[in-house]
């Protein structure tokens, strides 16, 4: 029941692996014909929150793209709202690095100093790195820090990114590959600025 109107939510999709099923809303107002709203136009995983007067559908904000938001209520129906930009948690600093066990690299980028370092250091290259590190991947604590890897789902071997956080020096290191380019890009670009632990990660990647 939302705003005094009985509703049913469900998922609808065409199948295949391009996009998952998307939510819809079926309203069943008393004394009126049922009304169908949606499915929502999104390829991303959508969650729903029930509020007294509305249903709020949303996708997770990612470094590569903002979170999408849709709101349904009995008065205005289903409408897209302003997106939610990805942002670091200002309360999360290097002291929270131990919490990144088994965390996707997107979670690591919620550490305020990590996101700030990447956005500032990568500059115009940040969108390419963010796109790859936000997709299919995983991460975990490793000796010396945190290591996360991700890649674009359909071009995983050619479009990928690696994020390494050095715990002892509190420094951030990034490696990413763009399809069609000769080799991976590094940040910092000068290998002499890489710590021994970060260089070990880089050498492992270069030998794969």
Label each PLM-derived region with a short phrase:
Residues 1, 47-48, 134-139:
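Short amphipathic beta-strand and strand-loop transition segments with alternating hydrophobic
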Residues 1-13, 112-132:
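N-terminal, post-signal-peptide region of Sec/Tat-exported proteins
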Residues 3-20, 25, 51-64, 145-150:
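Short beta-strand elements that form the blades of beta-propeller/WD-repeat-like
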Residues 17, 33-34, 153-157:
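Short, structured surface segments that line ligand/substrate-binding pockets
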Residues 24-27, 140:
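N-terminal start-of-domain structural block
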Residues 30-125, 159-208:
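Acidic, small-residue rich beta-repeat scaffolds with periodic aromatic anchors
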Residues 121-170:
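Intrinsically disordered, low-complexity segments enriched in Gly and acidic/Ser/Thr residues
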